[in-house]
Amino acid sequence: MRVLVAIDGPAGAGKSTIAKLVAKKFNLMYIDTGAMYRAITYLAQNKNITPSNVEGLCNLINSISMYFKDDKIIVNGEDLSEEIRKPNVSSNVSLYASVLEVRTLLVDIQKDLACKYEVVMDGRDIGTVVMPHAPFKFFLTATPEIRADRRYKELKEKSQKVEYKNILEEIIKRDYIDSNRKVSPLKKAKDAIEIDTTNYHIEEVVDKISKLIESTIIKEKGRITK
């Protein structure tokens, strides 16, 4: 049994933090697909490539080297992990991620990684598009207010000047765009386990997911040895 874990959910639901910890626990590769879209957004903005410039975006994606190392995203040899979390990227990433050609190119890369490695992958369309046959699918949720508060605290810890009100408005806007886009909209896979993280600590969610994965692996091993 290949261990492929899909973790989907809206911004601020705790996907990345939880996915990293689950990947570490099971010694799996962690793929932050959101970081990939953020990286493209960051690079496109720096080159003045708008979301409507499809050809420019495709040329950009095809011209770069992108990989993950120690939970960091490296693009053309440069660590962009901090740059892609800044407000100007966060407020525009959904617009770039909604471009069909952008999603097609990045989804192909993500699918290729899932074929080559056992992975924990988080995003918005992992269980529905990227890894529809993954044996482990989870959909994390939380109230917009809680998600905004988490993002606010995260950015404040990085000494970024942010306002809670602006973050909440941005999250509500992103929820709408992500859920209503024509290409790979944010939605729960039919066979995904939904976990509301509003009143749970990160460690509790990781423990819940880990136990579900472990129990399935044990059952599968028992079935094979019979």
Curated annotation (Swiss-Prot):
It comes from the Bacteria. It is an enzyme of class 2 (transferase). Its main location: cytoplasm. GO terms for biological process: nucleobase-containing small molecule interconversion; pyrimidine nucleotide metabolic process. It catalyses: CMP + ATP = CDP + ADP; dCMP + ATP = dCDP + ADP. It holds the Pfam family Cytidylate_kin. Keywords: ATP-binding, Cytoplasm, Kinase, Nucleotide-binding, Transferase. The keyword Transcription does not apply. GO terms for molecular function: ATP binding; CMP kinase activity; dCMP kinase activity. CDD domains: CMPK. Its EC number is 2.7.4.25. ATP binds at G9, P10, A11, G12, A13, G14, K15, S16, T17. Transmembrane segments: none annotated. Disulfide bonds: none annotated. PANTHER family: CYTIDYLATE KINASE (PTHR21299:SF2), CYTIDYLATE KINASE/PANTOATE-BETA-ALANINE LIGASE (PTHR21299). Belongs to the cytidylate kinase family. Type 1 subfamily. This is Cytidylate kinase. It comes from Clostridium tetani (strain Massachusetts / E88).
